[in-house]
């Protein structure tokens, strides 16, 4: 199912980012400062990163809000690619949402680990939005812990939206803290239950162990989620991330509100 979200608290600004608690701010992507907003519908047009800039020759833009949902596979969440028709991983990909894919550090499957050499470690301050941060959320019913992972600027503005829309389902939540990698802390790639925005945002469940993460075989099935007592919280987080994850572009009233209607995507629970 899906729903709207809850969130961690804001974090200090990373060097790649600048954001405000009102859900807007800016990032540096492709050598250009670009405004972001939790109410942006996205940018339909694409442009090419100039030579001399990081990832010169790749394209940025083209991703809209109704295409932000991926799957549990690293390399999903790209427009028109809600599964992984172009393969696991993010090597050589363009940037439809301007943000870079997440990285998890060493000790992960090869197609995940290789992203470190391309996009830097989780604490890389050159990434659009700054270093990676994570925040945790616990529901009312049990000790199930969900985590959201993304760049600092995204976490700073998304947290307010999540807290606003999912407060009724949250028993406890942490503020956003720097993410040091899967070697030392959650979330780990095998704990991710949903990727968003070209694999630049992830929602995870502590203790979930998706065996498909440990193989390059694209036909390997995902491990089913365990029975959950906090489905309302999971649904709320999932839909609110989709509805309010910051995108490049200006605020639009058409993108406002807690839900995505028909464009919401279900987290697979069996």
Language-model features: locations:
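Amphipathic alpha-helical interaction segments
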Residues: 77, 82, 106-108, 204, ...
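Intrinsically disordered, low-complexity segments enriched in Gly/Tyr/His/Pro and basic residues
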Residues: 1-98
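Terminal or extended low-complexity segments
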Residues: 110-270
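Membrane-inserting effector segments that mediate pore formation, membrane fusion
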Residues: 90-107, 111-112
């Amino acid at each position: 199912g899906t729903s709207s979200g809850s969130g961690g608290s804001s974090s200090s600004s990373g060097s790649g980012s600048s954001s405000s608690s009102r859900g807007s701010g800016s990032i540096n992507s492709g050598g250009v400062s670009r405004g972001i907003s939790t109410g942006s519908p996205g940018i339909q047009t694409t442009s090419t990163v100039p030579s001399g800039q990081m990832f010169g020759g790749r394209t940025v833009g083209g991703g809209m809000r109704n295409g932000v949902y991926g799957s549990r596979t690293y390399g999903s969440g790209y427009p028109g690619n809600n599964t992984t028709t172009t393969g696991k991983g993010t090597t050589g990909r363009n940037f439809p949402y301007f943000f870079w894919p997440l990285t998890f550090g060493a000790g992960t499957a090869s197609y995940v680990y290789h992203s470190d050499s391309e996009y830097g470690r989780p604490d890389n301050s050159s990434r659009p939005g700054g270093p990676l941060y994570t925040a945790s959320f616990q529901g009312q019913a049990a000790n199930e812990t969900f985590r959201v992972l993304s760049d600092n600027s995204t976490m700073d503005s998304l947290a307010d939206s999540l807290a606003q829309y999912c407060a009724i389902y949250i028993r406890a939540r942490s503020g956003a803290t720097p993410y040091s990698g899967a070697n030392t802390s959650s979330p780990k790639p095998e704990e991710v239950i949903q990727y968003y925005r070209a694999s630049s945002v992830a929602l995870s469940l502590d203790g979930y162990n998706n065996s498909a993460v440990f193989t390059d075989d694209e036909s390997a099935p995902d491990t089913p989620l365990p029975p959950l007592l906090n489905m309302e919280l999971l649904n709320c987080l999932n839909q609110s991330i989709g509805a309010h994850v910051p995108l490049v572009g200006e605020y639009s009233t058409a993108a406002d509100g807690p839900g995505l209607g028909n464009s919401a995507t279900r987290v697979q629970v069996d």
